[in-house]
């Protein structure tokens, strides 16, 4: 059997590196919502296109924002 080759898309660029962001503020919910799915899950690096450093900062910012109820943990289904 022939093995199908996966299609690779264009490599995404880290939006925080482009803006030269030194920190990610947990109070900016509009920016954080772009990196959370409709179900409330944090988007992985391969989909969001962030570098490892900013992905870690983004994850902690989203978790902080959830803890003080600026972002929901999940949707009501």
UniProtKB/Swiss-Prot annotation:
GO terms for biological process: translation. Belongs to the bacterial ribosomal protein bS18 family. InterPro entries: Ribosomal_bS18, Ribosomal_bS18_CS, Ribosomal_bS18_sf. One of its GO terms (molecular function) is structural constituent of ribosome. The keyword RNA-binding applies. NCBIfam families: S18 (TIGR00165). PROSITE patterns: RIBOSOMAL_S18 (PS00057). The keyword Cell membrane does not apply. It holds the Pfam family Ribosomal_S18. Disulfide bonds: none annotated. It comes from Desulforamulus reducens (strain ATCC BAA-1160 / DSM 100696 / MI-1). Binds as a heterodimer with protein bS6 to the central domain of the 16S rRNA, where it helps stabilize the platform of the 30S subunit. It comes from the Bacteria. Keywords: Ribonucleoprotein, Ribosomal protein, RNA-binding, rRNA-binding. GO terms for cellular component: cytosolic small ribosomal subunit. This is Small ribosomal subunit protein bS18. Part of the 30S ribosomal subunit. Forms a tight heterodimer with protein bS6. PANTHER family: 30S RIBOSOMAL PROTEIN S18, SMALL RIBOSOMAL SUBUNIT PROTEIN BS18M.
